[in-house]
């Protein structure tokens, strides 16, 4: 029995999504498979994707450049939210998934497809991100996930593909699964599945080993307008150029490497290796500029919801009502987050060592201990008495 007639398949050119093409046609009775690959700035990974899809049995192969919306509509809001999943992961992969889901739905509607398919397994987070985002954008469209059902091991998947002329792309000497876009890389599988094993240097593609980084620090200046990075070292530039250059600069100093045990949505712990040089530096710089321009209560409240925001993105709820509500709050907080931060890059560390803003709430005359001090020291005694009054009353009652 046919699962669908015409399917738009999220396509990467890898073995799993390539095998999906003959599998959908031969096992599930799909008549036409249209592949869609998103150009997210992953570079040469997309070379030959169109030809490979057509050779694997697709009737049409689409490659859509979405680098600019990835930066403007997904990365920049995440920077404004200081989004770090479990305080470490800048969400490079997770941010791309709702964007891919969006263009999949648009393509399905344009080509009259009755289903969308992806090659995610039943063990990872991406299946959730795709399914939930697609359902949010078009609840009527059917979602097919062959890899969730076919029950084939990695070796069996490769063998199935070879029956239909699909070559295995992963050599025994390089068993890693890699997801890359302009925001960063995610590396897993192979020996990395042992959390005790140090990742070999060969897995990294965006950052230098600390031993190979410069022996002198490099200082950079990042300009922000309303929480969005707009300049690097005094030169205004668009988001793509800025992140590309900052990836190179920060990566040269070994910044942005993350080795973590992360809690997946499906209930398991996973060892993940990430590289995200630019996003790491931008979030550190943005967070510091907020400390200069936001009031204490707004800062504390915003810090409290940043982890919630990160969890929503990680868990595939980009298009959820709560995410929309948090976006509205965050945008309001960014009205005055404009200024420049100076960052010292050295041996894997990005340290903010200077910040300035026309909206700065820092008052030298109030903060200084020098002769210019204008703080009313005498007012402190009354403030302390009132501030500590509840504790004083509690203590008196306790002592009887």
From Swiss-Prot:
InterPro entries the UniProt entry points to: Arginosuc_syn_C (IPR048268), Arginosuc_syn_N (IPR048267), Arginosuc_synth (IPR001518), Arginosuc_synth_CS (IPR018223), Arginosuc_synth_type_1_subfam (IPR023434), AS_cat/multimer_dom_body (IPR024074), Rossmann-like_a/b/a_fold (IPR014729)
- Which superkingdom, per the lineage? Bacteria
Please list the reactions this protein catalyses: L-citrulline + L-aspartate + ATP = 2-(N(omega)-L-arginino)succinate + AMP + diphosphate + H(+)
The annotated pathway is:
Amino-acid biosynthesis; L-arginine biosynthesis; L-arginine from L-ornithine and carbamoyl phosphate: step 2/3
- Please provide, in alphabetical order, the Gene Ontology terms of the cellular component aspect for this entry: cytoplasm
EC numbers on record: 6.3.4.5
* Pfam short name (any one): Arginosuc_syn_C
**Subcellular compartments:** Cytoplasm
- What is one process in the GO biological process aspect for this record? urea cycle
Keywords (A to Z) from UniProt:
Amino-acid biosynthesis, Arginine biosynthesis, ATP-binding, Cytoplasm, Ligase, Nucleotide-binding
Ligand binding (L-citrulline)? 89, 125, 129, 177, 262, 274
Q: Where does L-aspartate bind?
A: 121, 125-126
Binding positions for ATP per the UniProt entry: 10-18, 38, 119
Instruction: Please name the top-level EC class of this enzyme.
Output: ligase
GO MF annotations in UniProt = argininosuccinate synthase activity; ATP binding
Matching PANTHER family: ARGININOSUCCINATE SYNTHASE
Q: How does it assemble?
A: Homotetramer.
State the family named in the UniProt similarity comment for this chain. Belongs to the argininosuccinate synthase family. Type 1 subfamily.
Instruction: Please identify the protein, giving its name as recorded.
Output: Argininosuccinate synthase
Tell me the organism: Trichodesmium erythraeum (strain IMS101)
Q: Which gene encodes it?
A: argG
């Amino acid at each position: 029995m046919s699962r669908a007639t015409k399917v738009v398949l999220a396509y990467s050119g890898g073995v799993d999504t390539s095998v999906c093409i003959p599998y959908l046609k031969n096992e599930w009775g799909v008549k036409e498979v249209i592949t869609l690959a998103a150009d997210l700035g992953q570079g040469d990974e997309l070379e030959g994707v169109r030809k490979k899809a057509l050779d694997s049995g697709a009737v049409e192969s689409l490659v859509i450049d979405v680098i600019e919306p990835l930066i403007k509509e997904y990365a920049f809001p995440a920077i404004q939210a200081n989004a770090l999943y479990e305080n470490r992961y800048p969400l490079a992969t997770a941010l791309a998934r709702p964007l891919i889901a969006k263009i999949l739905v648009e393509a399905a509607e344009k080509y009259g497809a009755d289903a969308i398919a992806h090659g995610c397994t039943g063990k990872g987070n991406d299946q959730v991100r795709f399914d939930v985002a697609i359902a949010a954008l078009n609840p009527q469209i059917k979602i097919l996930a062959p890899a969730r059902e076919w029950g084939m091991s990695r070796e069996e998947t490769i063998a199935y593909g070879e029956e239909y002329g699909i070559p295995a792309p992963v050599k025994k000497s390089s068993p890693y699964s890699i997801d890359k876009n302009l925001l960063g890389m995610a590396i897993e599988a192979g020996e990395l599945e042992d959390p005790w094993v140090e990742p070999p240097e060969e897995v990294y593609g965006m950052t230098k080993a600390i031993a190979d980084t410069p022996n002198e620090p490099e200082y950079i200046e990042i300009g922000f307008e309303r929480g969005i990075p707009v300049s690097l070292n005094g030169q205004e530039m668009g988001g793509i150029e800025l992140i590309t250059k900052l990836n190179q600069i920060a990566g040269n100093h070994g910044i942005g490497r993350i080795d973590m045990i992360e809690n997946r949505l499906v209930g398991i712990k996973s060892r993940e290796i990430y590289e995200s040089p630019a996003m790491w530096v931008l979030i550190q710089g943005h967070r510091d500029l907020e400390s200069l321009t936001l009031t204490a209560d707004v800062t504390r409240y915003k810090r409290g919801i940043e982890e919630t925001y990160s969890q929503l993105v990680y868990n595939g709820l980009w298009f959820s009502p709560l995410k929309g509500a948090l976006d509205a709050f965050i945008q309001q907080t960014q009205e005055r987050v404009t200024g420049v931060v100076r960052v010292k890059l050295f041996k894997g560390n990005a340290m903010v060592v200077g910040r300035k803003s026309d909206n700065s709430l820092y008052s030298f005359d109030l903060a200084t201990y020098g002769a210019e001090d204008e703080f009313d020291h005498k007012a402190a005694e009354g403030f302390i008495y009132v501030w500590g009054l509840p504790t004083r009353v509690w203590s008196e009652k306790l002592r009887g």
